[in-house]
Design a protein with these regions (language model features):
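Non-transmembrane functional regions of envelope-associated proteins
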Residues: 1-178
């Protein structure tokens, strides 16, 4: 491995080259964020799940393809809207999130990944994860991991596509979406 200074200089040079590249944006992707106007309208976050269920219905009526929700639903809704929310999640392709943690946990979201050879030696490894409620995970078409791999200077330039969590291999959110 290179000395820290050499590594940082190489990474910053890479950043400079990428920063000067012309960027194009797809018209096929829409990102919906939770902004100040939405918080004024619906109240503080997290919103009750029936509000989120209504938003999924609105997106479906707008004929969206895939809905990706990078929101961790690891606890029951305090307003009791999980059943309606689960019903709306099953309207079409909805992808949920799971996150990694430093302590070993049971893997609440069993998902399949095809393996050829032994990929485990090459994957980022985490002892456990915090997944969505099992009943909500069952209503979605997929669950992807959101995690990054920052470089020595603290900047994230790459995201692991697969991760080993406990004894299982999980895809990241982007791969699960595809």
């Amino acid at each position: 491995q290179d000395p820290w200074v050499k590594e940082v200089l190489r990474l910053k040079s890479f950043d400079y080259l990428l920063g000067n590249e012309e960027k194009s944006r797809s018209q096929d992707i829409t990102i919906i964020t939770i902004d100040e106007a939405a918080i004024e309208k619906y109240g503080q976050w997290p919103w009750p799940r029936d509000v989120l269920a209504d938003k999924i219905v609105e997106l479906r009526q707008a004929e969206t393809g895939i809905i990706v929700m990078p929101i961790l639903f690891s606890e029951s809704d305090r307003f009791g809207g999980d059943i309606e929310f689960c019903d709306k999640l099953s309207y079409g392709t909805v992808i949920a999130q799971t996150g990694t943690v430093q302590k070993r946990t049971s893997n609440p979201v069993p998902r399949g990944v095809a393996k050829i050879g032994d990929p485990l030696a090459f994957l980022y490894e985490w002892p456990g994860m915090v997944g969505p409620l099992p009943e909500l995970a069952d209503c979605t078409n997929g669950v992807g991991v959101i995690n990054t791999a920052p470089e020595v200077d603290g900047v994230t330039r790459r995201v692991p596509l697969l991760m080993k969590i406990g004894d299982e291999v999980y895809p990241n959110m982007a791969i699960e979406t595809i």
